[in-house]
């Protein structure tokens, strides 16, 4: 087995002033020993309890995310596991930290009219630390569920790094490179990737393994997602595709 993945990373050149060079690609190498796949907020698209609410908010974005999980993210995770890359799930939660007294809770209540403590309660947590209940959103199905050897980190804001154990886990694993997938691109995945860069992790996002929250009457379908992909390529890291990643995993594992 080869010990290194090689992927073409796309980025955007915002120079020279007044005449940007635009998109470019370069070969990026990822040692298996210091690379992990980061999976942000993917839940079971077919889990019965997930049909009442989706973190993707709009019907269009929810529909697109379900297709992406089934057709693109699952093969990516299967490929990563097959060559021994750590797979790290980052998921919403409701810790007992008086979130209702926070500006974050107020903003979510005003924009989505949801009680985060109730929305993200779980029935398999310590009720002394987390809000215990039967969440109607944090459910997995056979396609999306973490495997026994995967890692699982709970978060309670958009960023998977804020007040969590994620950075500790990555440093203990010796990770320097993150292959990122999940949702929503303009919220939790985006915030997590920004915080990863600030902590000196190199970020590669699989651009067909994510989607943004697109608003009816404001965003033509796909436009806000496309703009955010370009933003990632301008200011956060690089992008590639699920097919390229899966093919490279197959090559490395052969």
Locate the predicted segments by residue.
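Active-site-adjacent betaalpha module
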Residues: 1-36, 43-54, 63-66, 75, ...
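A short, gly/pro- and small-residue-rich
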Residues: 57
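Active-/binding-site microenvironments in catalytic and ligand-binding cores
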Residues: 70
């Amino acid at each position: 087995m080869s010990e290194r993945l090689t992927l073409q990373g796309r980025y955007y050149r915002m120079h020279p002033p007044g005449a940007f060079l635009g998109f470019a690609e370069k070969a990026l190498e990822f040692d298996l020993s210091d690379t992990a796949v980061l999976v942000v907020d993917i839940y079971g698209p077919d889990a019965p309890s997930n049909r009442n609410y989706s973190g993707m908010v709009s019907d269009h974005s929810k529909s697109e995310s379900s297709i992406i999980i089934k057709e693109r993210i699952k093969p990516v995770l299967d490929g990563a596991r097959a060559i021994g890359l750590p797979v790290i799930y980052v998921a919403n939660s409701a810790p007992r930290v008086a979130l209702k007294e926070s500006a974050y809770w107020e903003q979510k209540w005003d924009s989505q009219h949801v009680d985060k403590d109730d929305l993200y309660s779980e029935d398999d947590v310590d009720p002394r630390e987390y809000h215990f209940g039967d969440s109607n959103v944090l459910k997995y199905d056979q396609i999306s569920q973490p495997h026994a050897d995967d890692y699982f980190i709970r978060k309670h804001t958009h960023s998977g790094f804020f007040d969590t154990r994620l950075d500790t886990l990555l440093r203990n694993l010796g990770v320097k490179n993150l292959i990122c997938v999940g949702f929503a691109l303009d919220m939790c995945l985006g915030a997590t990737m920004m915080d990863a860069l600030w902590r000196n992790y190199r970020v590669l996002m699989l651009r067909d393994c994510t989607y943004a929250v697109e608003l009816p009457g404001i965003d033509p379908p796909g436009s806000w997602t496309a703009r955010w992909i370009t933003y990632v390529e301008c200011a956060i890291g690089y992008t590639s595709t699920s097919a390229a990643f899966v093919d490279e995993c197959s090559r490395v594992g052969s």
